[in-house]
């Protein structure tokens, strides 16, 4: 049996469960696959299979993540669930599993707990754009007023962290009851069906990479006699057509040029698009004007910045990270896309140091500007080894 071919008939959305430990994230994930499976939209993945998620390495960081997939009438979902709290933090910060939306699971028996807060804050910081709430274990709460109270508390917490708390769908149910039923039309399965409907209607279809403004991180620069300068790299998003204007952004002053040729596998094309490894021929550019670490981009689509706020996970000693804490004034390298740039870290007021294994929010000032926008991922390196992973949460200047 070869691998099944992935049939792309429906739009694809990446989603995941977040929330406090033991509030039922994994049970809900299993229940979704079961109910979707009973409705003929995927195959059931049992709790134990999800719970013993294999460990994966993302930029040298070990993360345990379970991936399941299921469909609704209109969409194909890829869903991530992490067994441990630390795995969530690493997952969200490294972007190992980019989420177009998240399902926040809150046990009605407990209400919002510390990790509920932390996951909402992280979702905000790393740019998970939409959340839907599943109020779990509602079968264990007899008091309707108590349910109302917990729902209100969750909505207020979401608003506090910048999500539209009043508008977010909140579905009440029991993940365990949904997991135990074999009838997709039963009252026990209904909340999971309602949750899937809420995901379909509330989480917008993500814009595809190809529809975004053109951007290609520059990996290499060649000069071809009689033709000019060629920059190579993998197109991250958008489309570049021969004859279009482009900008070279980052490290130095922004320079304008025109793309006079696109080639791939030594063949000339009239355009390159997201995912293609291409060489782009640039008019009027000298080889020494361009370097690895800059980006080729659609005019005015991205600006260079030096100072930003970051949400960062610092590798533990066991993951090959530092053995000692660092303090304000620490100067490691920040690896953005294709290159390392030195930066100086300023910890938040009242934070004395950051220990290996911590996640932290701090400010970074680079020695040279990089083409940057909110949500850009980076690695922190020291002498060539990765000691942290982060995401730009806010641009300061």
From Swiss-Prot:
Family: Belongs to the TRAFAC class translation factor GTPase superfamily. Classic translation factor GTPase family. EF-Tu/EF-1A subfamily.
GO cellular component: cytosol
One Pfam family of this chain: GTP_EFTU_D2
Job description of the protein: GTP hydrolase that promotes the GTP-dependent binding of aminoacyl-tRNA to the A-site of ribosomes during protein biosynthesis.
PROSITE patterns: G_TR_1 (PS00301), G_TR_2 (PS51722)
CDD domains the UniProt entry points to: EF_Tu, EFTU_II, EFTU_III
Protein name: Elongation factor Tu
Subunit structure: Monomer.
């Amino acid at each position: 049996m070869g691998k099944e071919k992935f049939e792309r008939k429906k739009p694809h959305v990446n989603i995941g469960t977040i929330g406090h430990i033991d509030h039922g994230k994994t049970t809900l994930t299993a229940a979704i696959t079961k109910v979707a499976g009973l409705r003929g939209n995927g195959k059931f993945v049992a709790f134990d299979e999800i719970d013993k998620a294999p460990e994966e390495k993302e930029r040298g960081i070990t993360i345990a993540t379970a991936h399941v997939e299921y469909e609704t009438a209109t969409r194909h979902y890829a869903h991530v669930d992490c067994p441990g709290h630390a795995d969530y933090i690493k997952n969200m910060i490294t972007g190992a599993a980019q989420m177009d939306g998240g399902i926040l699971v809150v046990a009605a028996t407990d209400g919002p707990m510390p990790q509920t807060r932390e996951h909402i804050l992280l979702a905000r910081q790393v740019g998970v754009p939409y959340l839907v709430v599943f109020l779990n274990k509602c079968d264990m709460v007899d008091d309707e007023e108590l349910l109302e109270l917990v729902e209100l508390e969750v909505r207020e917490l979401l608003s506090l962290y910048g999500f539209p708390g009043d508008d977010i769908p909140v579905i009440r149910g029991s993940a365990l009851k949904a997991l135990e039923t074999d009838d997709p039309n039963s009252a026990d399965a209904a909340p999971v069906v309602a949750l899937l409907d809420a995901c379909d209607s509330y989480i917008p279809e993500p814009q595809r990479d190809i529809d975004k403004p053109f951007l290609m991180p520059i990996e290499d620069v060649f000069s071809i006699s009689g033709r000019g300068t060629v920059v190579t790299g993998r197109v991250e998003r958008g489309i570049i057509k021969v004859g279009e204007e482009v900008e070279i952004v980052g490290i130095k002053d922004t320079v304008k040029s025109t793309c006079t040729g696109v080639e791939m596998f030594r063949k000339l094309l009239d355009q390159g698009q997201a995912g293609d490894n291409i060489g782009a021929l640039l008019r009027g550019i000298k080889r020494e004007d361009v370097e690895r670490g800059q980006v080729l981009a659609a005019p005015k689509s991205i600006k260079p910045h030096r100072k930003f706020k970051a949400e960062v996970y610092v590798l533990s000693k066991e993951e090959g990270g530092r053995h000692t804490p660092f303090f304000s004034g620490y100067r490691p390298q920040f690896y953005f896309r294709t290159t390392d740039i030195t930066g100086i870290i300023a910890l938040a007021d009242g934070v004395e140091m950051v220990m290996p294994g911590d996640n932290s929010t701090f400010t970074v000032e680079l020695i040279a500007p990089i083409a940057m926008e909110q949500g850009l991922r980076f690695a922190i390196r020291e002498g060539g080894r990765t000691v942290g992973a982060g995401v730009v949460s806010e641009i300061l200047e």
